[in-house]
Amino acid sequence: HPGDLIQVDTLTVTLGPGETIQHFSAVDLFTRFSLAEVHTRATANPAASFLARLMVQAPFPIRAVQVDGGSEFMSDFEEVCERLGVKLFVLPPRSPKLNGHVERMQRTFRDEFYTRPLPSQIPELQKKLDAYLDHYNRERPHRALNGLAPLEFLAMMQEESAPQSHMC
């Protein structure tokens, strides 16, 4: 079901000489709904902030997240998961294939988003990233979803699971 498991990871992106940012990504395994946020550092505090944003912006409740064993997903991040009632699954070291959906999503960000000229200031970059994600979640066809965008797929699944009226 939507929100049953969200994979989360970070990606270091070089925007130019001496300009790197930390890109936090999340993808729902059922709908492929994705969210991302950029920060200057990949530490527990930005990771916890990203999780809080995900909880608010996801169109369904988040029940569990899966992360690699990176230090950014310890302490503050673990506390936020516990406080929000979100199960946390931490993968063993050096097992990126177990986080394959978010790893693939990060490749999509590299290929489709980070190949264009982008601002190096975090607020402006986040605005561009949010616009890309809006397109990704609402309009971009996904082969794994039979050509639907994640939010189209979610709407279809919700319609199919809605109670049917038996009145004539």
What role is predicted for each listed range?
Residues 54-59:
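Phosphate/pyrophosphate-binding loops at sites that engage ATP/ADP/AMP, CoA/4′-phosphopantetheine
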Residues 9, 32, 65-68, 99, ...:
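Short, conserved catalytic/metal-binding motifs centered on acidic residues
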Residues 33-37, 89-91, 115:
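Short small-residue beta-strand/loop micro-motif enriched in glycine and branched aliphatics
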Residues 77-79:
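Short amphipathic alpha-helical segments
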